[in-house]
A protein has these predicted regions:
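Mobile genetic element proteins and their domesticated derivatives, centered on retroelements
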Residues: 24, 30-31, 62, 75, ...
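Conserved pre-motif C helix in the palm subdomain of viral-like polymerases
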Residues: 127, 140-165, 169-172, 176, ...
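A common structural junction motif
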Residues: 227, 274-281
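Conserved beta-strand/loop block within the catalytic cores
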Residues: 73-151, 169-173, 231-252
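Short, conserved interaction/coordination micro-motifs, predominantly
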Residues: 1-101, 120, 124, 138, ...
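Catalytic palm subdomain of template-directed nucleic-acid polymerases
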Residues: 109, 173-184, 209, 240-276, ...
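Reverse-transcriptase-like RNA-dependent polymerase core
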Residues: 28-59, 108-134, 143, 169-199, ...
Length: 308
């Protein structure tokens, strides 16, 4: 086909089908960042420099992680969160009490394109050893269904509402627990002065059976105190009205999406959450629960091109 001018369109008949050939692909049909396929030498060098400080291999055991400075830093960051949130206090193990074991879990966090952006180390407790009535009582916490997320996006799209997302860093550490629970010291980070001591928990840890409920109660109580109302059917949906404007908040454990008919209400909600919790990954909704989302003036598009 000969070269085309900017506004020129050619047609051709192939086996009875009419094919329209455009010089440029329609921009409104492109999903993803248009410029992502163009990488300059400077961008490539910056990317290589960044990835040089990210470990690609996920350790299976903490002994392997301790040999990699990237993972050691991730483990130290996790323990720093424990100190900030006053999660526990070290003490001798009381008589007739059994401590719950702890272990490290290592994961590489990826963005919507599948690129590794962070090494995440998480200390979890071995909740399978908990005994009902002793270490925990109630465990149920509502979780949003994927259908609810899609309905949220559909409602926002039909009402021209921009949807944003945020993530609560180490969310379960904010949940207050009522039971008396003791856990073993983190492997590789034992206190040399008291190697036989244990930690008494004041807040929830990942792996505890009551941790999801403790976090949900903490977050929902905070929202209800700030003039939100909880959905009658979907207990993970919260609403706040100011005059004729509405702010909608959908919760999926520690991931939150929200949107409003008034952009000022979204900005105020961000400040409200930051005043109580340490937040991360705040911005326009682009990647959520494995779904890639692109919000445009002509609609909201959901796809999973990273898996193709």
């Amino acid at each position: 086909i000969s070269s085309l001018d900017d506004d020129e369109v050619q047609t051709a008949n192939v086996q009875g089908l009419q094919i329209i050939v455009h010089k440029d692909h329609p921009l409104d049909q492109i999903l993803g960042d248009i410029a992502s396929g163009v990488v300059t030498r400077n961008q490539l060098s910056n990317f290589c420099l960044y990835t040089a400080f990210i470990s690609v291999i996920e350790p299976k055991k903490y002994q392997e992680a301790l040999r990699d400075n990237n993972w050691v830093e991730a483990m130290q960051d996790e323990l720093l969160q424990f100190k900030k949130q006053q999660v526990w206090e070290i003490c001798p193990l009381p008589k007739n009490k059994l401590p719950i074991g702890t272990r490290w879990v290592f994961r590489n966090k990826q963005d919507e394109s599948g690129t590794i952006i962070k090494n995440k180390a998480r200390l979890v407790v071995q909740g399978f050893s908990q005994e009902e009535g002793i270490d925990y009582d109630e465990t149920f916490a509502p979780v949003a269904r994927l259908e609810a997320i899609r309905l949220f996006l559909a409602y926002a799209c039909s009402n021209k509402i921009k949807v944003y997302q945020m993530d609560v860093k180490s969310a379960f550490l904010y949940g207050k627990i009522k039971e008396e629970v003791y856990v073993c010291q983190p492997p590789g980070f034992e206190d040399p002065s008291h190697p036989d001591w244990v930690y008494k928990l004041d807040k929830a840890l990942y792996g505890l059976k009551q941790a999801p409920r403790a976090w949900y109660e903490t977050l929902s109580s905070f929202l209800l105190k700030n003039n939100f109302t909880r959905g009658a059917i979907d207990q993970t949906l919260f609403k706040r009205y100011v005059g004729t404007d509405v702010l909608l908040v959908q919760i999926y454990v520690d991931d939150i999406i929200f949107g409003s008919t008034n952009n000022r209400m979204c900005a105020d909600f961000k400040k409200l959450m930051q005043s109580k919790f340490e937040m991360s990954a705040m911005g326009e909704m682009q990647y959520f629960l494995g779904l890639q989302i692109k919000q445009q003036s002509n609609g909201t598009f959901i796809h999973q091109s990273k898996y193709v």
